[in-house]
Amino acid sequence: NDIFYQIASFMNNFEPVRWRWSHSLHHSYTASIDPHDFEVEGSIFWAPKNLFNFFIVFVPGISLIFFHKSLHKEIIWHALGLETRVMKECIPDDKKKDCINSSRLFVALWLVIIFCSIIFNSLLPILLFLLPKCFASLNMVWGLTQHMGLKEGIKDHRFSTRSIRLNPIFSFIYWKMEYHIEHHMFPLVPSHNLPKL
């Protein structure tokens, strides 16, 4: 499981140590202000009273334009050993070095992919390994449905989380995470078993 977690984290630009701890906090304090739930901000561009920022996340490739607000920037900061707010508030002190090392590995892999593209005179490595997440607007739609517009700062997942229905193809792509209340109530159940709950 851990190997696939590492691969999926790289594919989604989620540094795995940071993601493990921020996601644990997200399950404990869904839609909470204090402690801050970094995963329910809607997106890196979301601000509660700014409708433009809300809709801009659906523009394919927008994270390339707003790089300074992206998870890429956070990974680079961590790779440089800089402590971000999410690192301070979510990651235990004894795991921060793991986060820094993992971020350095991510940056090294990005550079290797770019180097391979230059050496082979082909954009294919970049198109296959670096850009797909930047154009995954459909996943953003599904992700935003999980908590947006629901109660904040409440411990009962039935009020801060929702499940939705997806067709079988989208359900496969989304790894059955449309069963999101079930995922929050039973986080250790593998995603393929969520429909059985």
Which residue stretches match the model-derived regions?
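General secondary-structure edge motif
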Residues: 3-6, 121, 153, 177
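N-proximal short alpha-helices
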Residues: 107-110, 114, 146, 150-153, ...
